[in-house]
């Protein structure tokens, strides 16, 4: 019955020598043991179920706020503004961007104001989605963008088994559409740089260019979007003081593609980077809404240069 003390000499629990405390402890212990022994008073499965659900909810909440360094309410107005760019995407992504299957040509979106007949077609993987919407503010166009399905003719990818059929359908549509004069090709080239993909991807992309130019189309190729490989809004805000971080530009895969005479190239690097170094912020906008897709705000700036430099058909 010694007094319980910690190494510093302070009490860490009630003194068992005190009669009232001993009675209270005994009574509480008896109540707890009685409750646990009587299976009718509780359900072990129920307790396990509720604890499991509770832990799951706590884990989900923790994962949600972990990249933000806490609740958004704790962030400065500047950081909250930067974080809002995770939603800076094309407002017609759900309707005009494909993820699977083989879309009918009737599903290709016609974007742009007025009743003018579109002369521009944007064909690409998801890196064409924001550009297509932004460009439609300057000229009416038709678009067919498909996640992880680049405009590389006869290119087969395991992640998108219908890509090869989709691309053939797009090509047939373009070859038989006399109204389309300009075809803008966009892709996240780095995504197809693996040993098993790169050769067939490059060959397929060059085949697309060949077929289009042979049919008299004006082909415009957008090169690799500067991609830091980390979520840009989260990275910029997950620090004490917001600093416009820089990263190295990588267009290794794109440089393997041979562009033929008559094909126009638009270089993002020319506007978004200085040499081989690219900032995560451009004109006070995060360049990406995630780790590789161009933010809509920056896309709206880029399309002005695309139209000016490459003389798109009105």
In which residue ranges do the predicted regions lie?
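Extracellular/periplasmic envelope-modification machinery, especially enzymes
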Residues: 38-314
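A charge-rich, low-complexity, intrinsically flexible signal that marks solvent-exposed coils, linkers
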Residues: 1-35
């Amino acid at each position: 019955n010694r007094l319980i003390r910690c190494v510093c000499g302070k009490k860490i629990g009630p003194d068992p020598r005190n009669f009232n405390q001993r009675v209270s402890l005994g009574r509480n212990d008896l109540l707890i043991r009685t409750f646990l022994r009587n299976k009718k008073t509780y359900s072990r499965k129920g307790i396990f179920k509720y604890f499991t659900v509770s832990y799951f909810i706590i884990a989900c909440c923790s994962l949600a706020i972990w990249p933000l360094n806490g609740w958004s309410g704790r962030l400065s107005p500047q950081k909250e503004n930067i974080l809002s760019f995770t939603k800076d995407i094309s407002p017609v992504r759900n309707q005009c961007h494909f993820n699977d299957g083989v879309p009918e040509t009737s599903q290709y979106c016609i974007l742009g104001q007025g009743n003018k007949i579109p002369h521009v077609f944007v064909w690409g993987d998801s890196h064409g989605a924001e550009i297509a919407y932004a460009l439609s503010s300057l000229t009416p166009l038709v678009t067919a963008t498909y996640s992880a399905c680049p405009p590389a003719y006869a290119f087969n990818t395991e992640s998108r088994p219908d890509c090869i059929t989709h691309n053939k359908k797009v090509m047939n549509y373009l070859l038989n559409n006399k109204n389309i004069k300009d075809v803008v090709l966009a892709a996240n080239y780095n995504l197809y740089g693996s040993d098993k993909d790169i050769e067939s991807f490059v060959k397929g992309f060059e085949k697309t260019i060949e077929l289009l130019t042979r049919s008299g189309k004006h082909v415009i190729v957008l090169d690799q979007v500067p991609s830091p490989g980390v979520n840009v809004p989260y990275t910029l805000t997950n620090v004490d003081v917001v600093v416009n971080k820089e990263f190295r530009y990588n267009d290794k895969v794109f440089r393997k593609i041979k562009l033929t005479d008559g094909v126009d190239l638009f270089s993002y690097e020319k506007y978004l980077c200085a040499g081989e170094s690219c900032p995560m912020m451009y004109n006070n906008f995060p360049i990406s809404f995630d780790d590789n897709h161009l933010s809509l705000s920056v896309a709206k700036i880029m399309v002005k240069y695309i139209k000016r430099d490459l003389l798109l058909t009105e």
